[in-house]
Amino acid sequence: MDIDASPQVHANQADDVFLIVGDKSKLQTFEERLQLNYDKGERYFEDKAVPDATIDDIDMDFVKEYTDEIDYGKSPLEYLKENRGFIKEKDGEIQISTAAILLFGKNPQNFFPRARIRFIRYEGTEEKFGTEMNVIKDVIFEGTLLNMINEAIAYLDTQVKEKTYLGSDGTFVTDAEYPKFVRQELIVNAVTHRAYSITGTDIQIKMFDDHIVVESPGKLPGLVRADNIRFTHFSRNPKIAEFLKNYKFVKEFGEGVNRMCNELEQVGLKDLVYHTNAFMLQAVIYNSNVGKTIVEKTAYSLIKLAVAVNKSLIDYQKPAIGEEKSAIDDKKSAVDKYVFIE
């Protein structure tokens, strides 16, 4: 018997909460129950007060930049106090929320050391360990969420291969191995929707020869599942999501995954794949080399080169005596039939 997931956390008369795992029910600890509340949106970790944080830990100059961006007329401090509960007063003390530190903090990693992005480049198509470790780049991005996103996107752009070829119209065309929007959206989604309550690990971008994996702490939130993620939206961190929306990383909530899938389809790449591995969500995209052997890749490159050379020669070929221009056009048409999508 299949039981649909509930959008709420339910407790029995003894106030115990159980999670169905396979055909068994597992009693949840206090921490596991709290994480369920965060995942289902009954509570938001971004609203949690940060111990020992004070107003001096907030970069008011950056808050001013943001309020200018959204045309907010009052002071930065008034914005933090009067909007979204970034700062609250309780029992005569000022409480600084997690969202305030992550978005506007002078040094968010002082309070959340693993709230960062780590880029790892591997040689080959799989992750190896020990004496076979194949890491060739390892770069960490820190700061506010906006700073991390901008730096990670810019760095990933430098790692993506580009190919230039002669198009059917006779002009040179340059394509990246992964669409730019897809690369950007994977990073934005990871930062926006990660479970910041899971403090022991960071967001990781793992780049291989034939695919990229973006790992983000936390499972799919709410009722979002791998089979409905393309058209279902749920925000684990609504304040963070709204902040990033105001910086126009995406036009509207919920359109990003669908657009990523569409762009991958348009360039002939495999579908975006999501996996849940323990407490980590993995998003995987593949480039055109996936599944090809070394021999196939070499042969493919040689054929492409031959076609490009032949096309160039035909373009500059003059009709021989007695040869009609239509014969040259027929040759061009034959070469144009070789359309390559890596």
Model-derived features with residue positions:
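Active-site helix-to-loop segments that bind/position phosphate- or nucleotide-bearing substrates
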Residues: 20-185, 190-199, 218-233, 256
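ATP-lid-like helix-loop hinge signature
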Residues: 194-216
